[in-house]
């Protein structure tokens, strides 16, 4: 999927291409949901949590950077920069944005506690306007073009906090069907925009496009209703960040990406 990603938007209509689009629409919400989970449970800053994350980054960056240097894919300077500055020199946009969120989150946590229901709704609207209208529809690089920005993560974090204080929906079937319908609609919109391009104002495979945001929130609320207890799922959950860091290393990504 990632291999063909640059061609998905401009590719001719075909069943095979639309099936790839469908799979992308199903999976693209993962990043948004990961950040919303952080907001739902709140980030708790501590030396231990930061050090644990930093050690994890240094370990994988050092391991694969040395391998890359050994195979001539990285210079000595790039190797040392990736080892000692894994957040900023590793080419991992997610880690840079998440670090910004990690540092700012205590302010959001404390501020949210002192807001009443009306103020929380107003602030939610403000975040959505900044992230979706200015960042996506207006394509303002100062804000959050395509969602690769800490502003988008702050919006998602706030949405996660907001959902945590909402009354949980008991009708998981309706939420599941709603999410499925949204994903199918997104796939149809992709086919339509081949003919009528202006529809991209509502949908494209960008993290802060309106339809992707809507699908992320509905899926997140649906997952809330699940009652699962699985060691395997927990193991996969804690491994997600490691998988992202590993696949972002040049020596690994070159095996999958040809662009």
Where in this protein do the model-derived segments appear?
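Loop-centered beta-sheet repeat module
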Residues: 120-167
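Aromatic-anchored segments of alpha-helical transmembrane domains
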Residues: 1-3, 60-69, 124-139, 179-194, ...
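Hydrophobic transmembrane alpha-helices
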Residues: 36, 40-44, 101, 105-109, ...
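Interfacial loop-to-helix transition and helix-capping segments at the boundaries
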Residues: 18-31, 82-97, 136-156, 188-217
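Alpha-helical transmembrane segments and terminal signal-anchor/GPI-anchor hydrophobic tails
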Residues: 150-151, 168-244, 248-259
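Membrane-interface helix-loop junction between the first two transmembrane segments
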Residues: 5-14
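Solvent-exposed interhelical
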Residues: 47-48, 102-128, 162-180
